């Protein structure tokens, strides 16, 4: 720099740089669009009606005022920015909730705007509560209405709070009205039967065929899904199929298609019970009541085909096996004081003897006869409670020692 404060360059170059800077500044600036008083008044009226106009409205205003659409957008944006904070907040909330049209009250004071916003929030909360109540009322109404069998599926339980008639339930096991049977236990048994692929008719018959006592009364009603007739036992809309059931049920049968079971009857107390084929020492019913063991005399099976005769299903029993006499002869050879845990040894020896006695079919033994023999052996073996046989053996050991002494 010189002593006079001027730069040491040429003045022509400095003027050239200044001109370039001025031209750049001019290029960046935009001319502000000015509306007339009439147009401004019209824009203010539109802004008072809706401060967030849609694209169609803005496009119409741009054509009418002979200006680009972005000019209309900028004017509305600047107009909204000049509103009070409370009013802007209220308009923003309404715009987010898509509650159109939104009216801007620019002439209101801040206190009035806050009061209006508070009232709006209160109304919104009340309307939300009313919607929730309406939804709940709708759900309760749907729950109370009658439900057809197609929509309910195969639910055997949880029908206490629904006004569903037994005729409309169809093949489902509804209202097992036995004294003292919790519906949850009956439902769990029925659902277990259905998970294993048992038809609904068998499920209904299984759930209705409940054993203990001798008093008989109608069991689970099954509605026929086809042409509903009248004049049969039950109502006029559907036919109720009544199976033999008993006064107080303590157990439900396992599914007949998966596992066979043994059926025995005591003539002294007129009580009948079912023992599982897993050779349990004692059976436990639905109430948790322990049932003492019994000698099983014959095998009852529900695997027979269900025939429809006069609108009713009848359970058929299988005939006794052909090798019944051979089984009785083999049974006499087995010791009578053996427990359930000795069945494996008995069965291995019995199987070897039976294979030598039974006729051969194409070089293979008759498996069906062996199966019936296994059932006969299990039926003739006494079922002792847990630990009873061990206690008897432990008590017999000191007796034998005393006799030897």
Curated annotation (Swiss-Prot):
Tell me yes or no: is ATP-binding among this UniProt entry's keywords. Answer: no
Task: Report the InterPro entries cross-referenced here.
Answer: Engrailed_Homeobox_TFs, HD, Homeodomain-like_sf
Name this protein carries in UniProt: Cytoplasmic polyadenylated homeobox-like protein
Q: Which GO terms describe its cellular component?
A: nucleus
Q: Is Transcription among the key words of this record?
A: yes
Q: Which residues bind DNA?
A: 28-87
Q: Which GO terms describe its molecular function?
A: DNA-binding transcription factor activity, RNA polymerase II-specific; RNA polymerase II cis-regulatory region sequence-specific DNA binding
**What does this protein's UniProt record list under function?**
Transcription factor that acts as activator.
An example GO BP is:
regulation of transcription by RNA polymerase II
Bias (Basic residues) occurs at 24-33
């Amino acid at each position: 720099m010189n002593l006079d404060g001027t730069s040491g360059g040429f003045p022509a170059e400095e003027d050239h740089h200044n001109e370039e800077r001025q031209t750049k500044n001019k290029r960046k600036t935009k001319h502000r669009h000015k509306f007339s008083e009439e147009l401004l008044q019209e824009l203010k009226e539109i802004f008072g009606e809706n401060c967030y106009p849609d694209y169609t409205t803005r496009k119409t205003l741009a054509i009418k005022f002979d200006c680009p659409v972005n000019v209309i957008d900028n004017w509305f944006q600047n107009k909204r920015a000049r509103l009070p904070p409370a009013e802007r907040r209220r308009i923003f909330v309404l715009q987010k909730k898509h509650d159109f049209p939104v009216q801007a009250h620019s002439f209101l004071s801040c206190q009035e705007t806050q009061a209006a916003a508070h009232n709006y929030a209160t109304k919104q909360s009340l309307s939300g509560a009313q919607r929730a109540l309406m939804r709940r009322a709708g759900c309760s109404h749907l729950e109370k209405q009658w439900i057809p069998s197609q929509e309910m599926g195969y639910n055997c339980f949880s029908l206490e709070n629904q006004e569903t008639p037994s005729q409309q339930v169809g093949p489902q096991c509804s209202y097992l009205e036995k004294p003292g049977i919790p519906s949850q236990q009956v439902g769990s048994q029925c659902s277990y039967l259905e998970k294993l692929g048992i038809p609904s008719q068998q499920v209904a018959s299984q759930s209705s065929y409940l054993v203990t006592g001798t008093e008989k009364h109608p069991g689970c009603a099954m509605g026929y899904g086809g042409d509903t007739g009248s004049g049969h036992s039950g109502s006029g809309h559907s036919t109720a199929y009544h199976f033999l059931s008993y006064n107080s049920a303590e157990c439900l049968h396992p599914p007949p298609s998966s596992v066979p079971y043994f059926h025995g009857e005591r003539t002294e107390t007129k009580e009948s019970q079912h023992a599982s084929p897993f050779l349990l020492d004692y059976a436990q019913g639905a109430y948790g009541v322990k049932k003492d063991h019994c000698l099983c005399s014959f095998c009852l099976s529900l695997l027979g085909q269900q025939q429809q005769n006069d609108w009713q299903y009848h359970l058929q029993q299988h005939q006794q096996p052909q090798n019944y006499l051979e089984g009785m002869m083999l049974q006499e050879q087995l010791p009578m004081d053996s427990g359930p845990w000795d069945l494996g040894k008995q069965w291995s020896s019995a199987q070897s003897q039976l294979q030598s006695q039974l006729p051969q079919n194409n070089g293979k033994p008759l498996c069906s006869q062996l199966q019936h023999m296994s059932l006969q052996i299990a039926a003739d073996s006494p079922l002792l409670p847990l630990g009873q046989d061990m206690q008897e053996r432990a008590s017999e050991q000191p007796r034998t020692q005393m006799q030897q002494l």
